[in-house]
């Protein structure tokens, strides 16, 4: 099963798992929509699970002033992916956010390459999902 994790904000963290970590990137919001459109039309299968961080599920302390915008973007992505036939799971923000690159390497030691905070957050959302054995 392919799993795509999206950390939504002004920039979207993107992590993709297909038996191994295949991509870890950061996109602008509209770039992300185009990537998802290409992905959904090319793959068009129910064997891909999309994880989207739901901003309102976090603690009050973790919420930012941009919460409303992030929440709207997350809900728009959820509705859009669902309309395209994709499986979506809204997930609670986890405690493994804003890791430094060296800390991130302890969880994904095989990943080589630069990462942004957004990409690492998406990668950790994916890591936690896989660790919990949820499919």
Residue ranges and their predicted role:
Residues 1-135:
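Phosphate- and other anionic-substrate recognition elements at nucleic-acid/protein interfaces
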């Amino acid at each position: 099963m392919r799993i795509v994790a999206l950390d939504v904000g002004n920039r979207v963290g993107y992590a993709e798992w297909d038996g191994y970590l295949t991509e870890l990137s950061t996109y602008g919001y509209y770039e992300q929509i185009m990537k998802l459109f290409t992905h959904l039309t090319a793959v068009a299968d129910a064997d891909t699970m999309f994880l989207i961080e739901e901003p309102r599920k976090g603690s009050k302390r973790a919420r930012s002033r941009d919460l409303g915008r992030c929440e709207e973007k997350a809900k728009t992505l959820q509705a859009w992916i669902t309309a395209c036939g994709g499986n979506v799971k809204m997930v609670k923000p986890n405690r493994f956010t804003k890791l430094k690159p060296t800390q991130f390497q302890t969880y994904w030691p095989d990943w080589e390459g630069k990462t942004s905070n957004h990409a690492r957050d998406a990668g950790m959302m994916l890591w936690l999902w896989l660790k919990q054995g949820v499919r």
